[in-house]
């Protein structure tokens, strides 16, 4: 069932891409006559110690995913990053699983970033300002995951002019509004999408209906010349129904997030940021059956709630020394499964008990810069309470780099991370449901990693980045009986993990040609119950390439050919 749905959606979304782009895969954009572009910036910006940012301005040259500028799909093309199984919208980094990557959307944790069963993500290309993946050194300001940090931020609205855009496709509709609240003082941004392939799905004999919709909003206002307040919201929902002779099955999931941020500049040497947030994920499954006087209706929900806060200070103590310090707090509630049913008029209500996880952390990072040298030395101290036990973790982190100039550099880093959350997958009526639970038996997951890499400018327009890493993990839970696990009756064992690999990325940029190619070799193993075996998502060799070329370039018009190979 799941495979049929995935194949059908894939064909539909490919059709959407063909409908929304010209037949020759050429994209068009207007250029101002008086502007001369000497060279494009690369699509991927490789920073030190495994941190890579996507150049949002250059994303317009990239091929569309199902007619969408999906930033998350490009993150999956980075060296050392995998989407997992076909169609997944996860980020599996350096031998880790999807739950080991912390995904922040304007500093709000996201538990399910998928639209259309993983073919697209919740991050609209019309609203994203920046996107970055940290695989090596991760600032002590962030924790609670073993493998990586992904930060995606939405842009502000235009503070000068009101703007509108509308995109109408064969299967989708999208619109964006932004502009000033008060000129030069504040702005608003509203963007919405609606995907409706029902007309095409109706061709199939099994009467499947599917769609998703989402809306993103952001308000920003300068309450003082040194203090800026912003409010961000997101809400999205996927829904599918399958009708048969006497039965109707429905599935769906949705995210809701909200954040309030205050950014302050106290003086030339001290800045602060305070964020309060709420995030909510719901998975649901609904069935209804009627035949010969018998009726059965049931609805099962799986929910995750989290609210929290983060306070960060950046302080410059001298020309060579600066500090980043602060605190975080979060309260998470997990409702693994709750079922309501009505069988011939009889009401039933059952489910697993809710679980709580309360956590807090203090962090400090020292940053030293002199000449071409840069060093970061920091520590994160965290506490996790699951209502039965409290566990503590101390996570030292450090990196050292040297910049030779002209885009040549080397770096070395070492990190220790801990994790108190467990994610596993279970199928209900052939549909996958992700469960999140806190740690069990007083054991946190732990990992340490060392990375060594460098970047060299081989030619005026050619840059090569290479990085190797080695990682160890322990207390990794392997769940073999989900019912016993959710009931607190065992159903799992602990294991260890090991991963090492080499990542390389080659970038070539000229005025008309942009080429980015990446290769990853990785070996990831797990060991549990005395048996060592390859990690489920281990891909020893992975190659991706993206190229775009301005086929025709003349004043007032430009034709760009783009191609992606994986």
Predicted regions and their residues:
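Gram-negative outer-membrane beta-barrel transporters
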Residues: 470-472, 492-566
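Surface-exposed extracellular loop regions of Gram-negative outer-membrane beta-barrel proteins
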Residues: 185-192, 196, 239, 272-296, 338-342, 354-388, ...
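Outer membrane beta-barrel strand-and-loop segments of large Gram-negative receptors
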Residues: 306-312, 351-363, 439, 443, ...
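Short, acidic, small-residue-rich periplasmic hinge/interaction motif at the N-terminus
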Residues: 20-61, 98, 265
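Periplasmic N-terminal accessory/gating domains of Gram-negative outer-membrane beta-barrel systems
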Residues: 48-96, 107-138, 155
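Short strand-turn segments of transmembrane beta-barrel domains in outer membranes
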Residues: 118-121, 129-140, 148-179, 187-210, ...
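Transmembrane beta-barrel wall of Gram-negative outer-membrane proteins
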Residues: 171-196, 205-239, 250-278, 317-323, ...
């Amino acid at each position: 069932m799941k495979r049929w749905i995935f194949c059908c959606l894939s064909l539909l979304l490919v059709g959407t891409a063909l409908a929304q782009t010209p037949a020759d895969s050429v994209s068009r954009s207007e250029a101002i006559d008086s502007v001369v572009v000497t060279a494009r910036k690369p699509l991927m910006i490789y920073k030190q110690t495994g941190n890579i940012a996507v150049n949002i301005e250059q994303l317009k040259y990239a091929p569309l995913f199902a007619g969408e500028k999906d930033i998350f799909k490009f993150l999956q093309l980075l060296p050392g990053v995998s989407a997992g199984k076909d169609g997944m919208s996860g980020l599996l980094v350096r031998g880790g699983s999807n739950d080991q990557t912390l995904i922040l959307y304007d500093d709000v944790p996201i538990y399910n970033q998928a639209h259309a069963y993983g073919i697209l993500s919740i991050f609209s290309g019309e609203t994203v300002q920046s996107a970055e993946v940290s695989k090596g050194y991760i600032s002590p300001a962030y924790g609670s995951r073993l493998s990586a940090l992904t930060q995606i931020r939405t842009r502000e609205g235009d503070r000068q002019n009101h703007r509108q855009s509308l995109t109408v496709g064969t299967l989708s509709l999208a619109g964006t509004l932004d502009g000033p609240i008060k000129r030069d003082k504040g702005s608003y941004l509203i963007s919405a999408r609606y995907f409706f392939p029902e007309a095409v799905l109706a061709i199939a004999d099994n009467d499947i209906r599917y769609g998703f919709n989402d809306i993103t909003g952001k308000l920003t206002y300068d309450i003082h010349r040194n203090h800026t307040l912003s409010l961000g919201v997101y809400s999205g929902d996927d829904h599918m129904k399958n009708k048969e002779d006497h039965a109707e099955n429905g599935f769906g999931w949705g995210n809701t997030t909200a954040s309030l941020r205050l950014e302050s500049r106290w003086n030339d040497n001290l800045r602060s940021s305070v964020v309060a947030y709420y995030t909510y994920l719901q998975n649901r499954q609904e069935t209804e059956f009627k035949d010969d006087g018998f009726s059965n209706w049931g609805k099962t929900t799986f929910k995750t709630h989290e609210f929290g806060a983060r306070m960060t200070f950046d302080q410059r103590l001298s020309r060579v020394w600066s500090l980043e310090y602060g605190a975080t707090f979060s309260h998470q509630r997990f409702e693994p499964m709750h079922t309501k049913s009505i069988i011939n008029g009889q009401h039933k209500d059952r489910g697993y008990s809710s679980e709580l996880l309360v956590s807090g952390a203090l962090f400090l990072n020292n940053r030293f810069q002199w000449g071409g040298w840069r060093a970061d030395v920091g520590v994160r101290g965290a506490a996790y309470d699951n209502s039965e036990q409290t566990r503590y973790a101390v996570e030292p982190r450090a990196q050292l780099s040297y910049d030779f100039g002209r885009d040549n550099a080397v770096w070395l880093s070492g990190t220790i991370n801990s994790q108190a959350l467990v994610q596993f997958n279970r199928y209900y009526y052939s549909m996958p449901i992700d469960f999140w639970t806190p740690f069990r038996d007083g054991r946190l997951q732990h990992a340490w990693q060392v990375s060594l890499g460098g970047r060299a400018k081989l030619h005026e327009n050619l840059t090569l980045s290479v990085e190797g890493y080695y990682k160890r993990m322990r207390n990794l839970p392997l769940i073999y009986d989900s019912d016993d696990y959710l009931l607190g009756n065992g159903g799992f064992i602990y294991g260890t993990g090991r991963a090492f690999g080499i990542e390389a990325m080659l970038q070539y940029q000229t005025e008309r040609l942009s080429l980015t190619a990446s290769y990853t070799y990785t070996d990831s193993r797990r060991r549990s119950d005395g048996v060592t075996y390859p990690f489920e998502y281990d891909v020893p060799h992975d190659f991706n390439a993206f190229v775009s070329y301005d086929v025709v370039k003349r004043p007032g018009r430009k034709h760009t050919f783009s191609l992606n190979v994986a």
